[in-house]
Each structure stands twice: as structure tokens, then as C-alpha cells.
């Protein structure tokens, strides 16, 4: 019952943040329809690794991450929630990047990340009390992103991931071939209002 109540509060919190939450700092270098080339500043994430299917991974990791930003840290400090929540397969073994298609929907390890506010540097980020939560600094980087609505199903993600891959190929953009998935809304958001993204790190 306690777990259900906490999850309910967390989802209410996310609902409020979906509209007002601070987004991680970046500049749009180029926009072409629903595709953008972005330059991201250095940022800090709190991440949890879970064993699950892609669709289950965020739910399994959310509680630990939400408790961390709610004060379950050494400093007992509450941290503002930002957008998006990102998701990345661990098996791809690359640093967690900014904005939670995968060809396989089977179980595997996934990293789910919350981004710290833009003014919170790595050295002042509170230390987690939960060993499952890890703090990581992400260097400044250039990313290609495609934005889309509707539900974050494997098919919908795969469709837009392929569109972004084709765009980068057509425009001779070198990239690291491992995606990051980014989600901005709580589950009950109407499908036509949802914001999802697939991102790839650009090689410079």
C-alpha cells in the first residue's frame, strides 16, 4: 500500500512538472521539420540501472529516482524535477546522454535517468543514500533529435528512430549508433499531446 501511495504521489508530481518543468539546457543549431540538431551544455544526471523490458524499465526505476530528488540523499535536499526522463540500453556501453528504435522488446539492462537542474553542478549534487542511484557528469555534446507524439510503443519509437537514421545518412552526419529515448509526460497524457524523442550523439 505504501508503494502504491508513493507511486501515486510521484505521478501527480510528474503531471505538474510536465508543463512547468525546466528542460535541460541546449541550443537548436538546425531545425528541419520534426528533426533538430542540438548543442547540449554539460549536465548532471541521477541514474538507475534495472533489469526489465524497455516498457517496464522506467516504472521500476522511477521510485528510487523520485525518492532521491525528494530528499532521500545525504544532504536531505529536495531537487526540482526537470524534463525529460531518459532511457538507454546498458548493453550499448556508451556514456549516458541527454535526451527514457529498440529492435528487441525482450528483457535486458536499461539505464533510466533524471536530469539535475541546469544550475546544479556535479560537485554540489547531493550524494544518494540509495546505492542503486548513481550521479554522473555528462560532457557538452551535439545531438540529433527527432520529436514525435502518440504512445511510446516499440513500433512508434522504431518508426521515428529509422526516420532520424535516414536523415543523418542523407545529410552525411556521423553519429554514434546507439539511441537515447526521452519522455516528457505522465502516462495519462492524451496521446496527441505527448512528447517523445529519439536522440543520437553526433561525432565531431
Question: How should each PLM-predicted stretch be described?
Answer:
Residues 2-5, 15-204:
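A solvent-exposed interaction/effector surface
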Residues 11-12:
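Repetitive helical segments and hydrophobic/amphipathic motifs
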Amino acid at each position: 500500500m505504501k508503494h502504491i501511495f508513493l507511486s501515486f504521489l510521484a505521478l501527480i508530481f510528474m503531471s505538474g512538472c510536465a508543463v512547468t518543468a525546466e528542460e535541460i539546457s541546449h541550443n537548436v543549431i538546425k531545425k528541419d521539420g520534426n528533426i533538430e540538431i542540438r548543442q547540449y551544455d554539460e549536465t548532471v544526471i541521477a541514474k538507475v540501472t534495472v533489469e526489465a523490458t524497455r516498457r517496464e524499465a522506467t516504472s521500476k526505476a522511477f521510485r528510487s529516482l523520485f525518492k532521491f530528488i525528494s530528499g532521500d540523499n545525504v544532504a536531505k535536499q529536495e531537487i526540482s524535477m526537470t524534463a525529460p526522463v531518459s532511457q538507454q540500453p546498458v548493453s550499448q556501453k556508451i556514456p549516458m546522454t541527454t535526451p527514457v528504435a529498440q529492435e528487441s522488446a525482450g528483457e535486458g539492462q536499461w539505464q533510466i535517468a533524471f536530469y539535475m537542474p541546469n544550475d546544479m553542478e556535479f560537485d554540489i549534487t547531493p550524494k544518494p543514500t540509495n546505492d542503486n542511484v548513481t550521479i554522473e557528469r555528462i560532457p557538452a555534446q551535439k545531438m540529433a533529435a527527432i520529436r514525435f507524439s502518440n504512445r511510446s510503443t516499440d513500433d512508434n519509437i522504431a518508426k521515428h528512430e529509422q526516420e532520424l537514421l535516414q536523415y543523418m545518412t542523407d545529410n552525411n552526419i556521423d553519429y554514434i549508433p546507439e539511441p537515447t529515448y526521452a519522455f516528457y509526460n505522465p502516462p495519462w497524457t492524451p496521446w496527441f499531446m505527448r512528447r517523445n524523442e529519439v536522440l543520437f550523439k553526433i561525432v565531431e
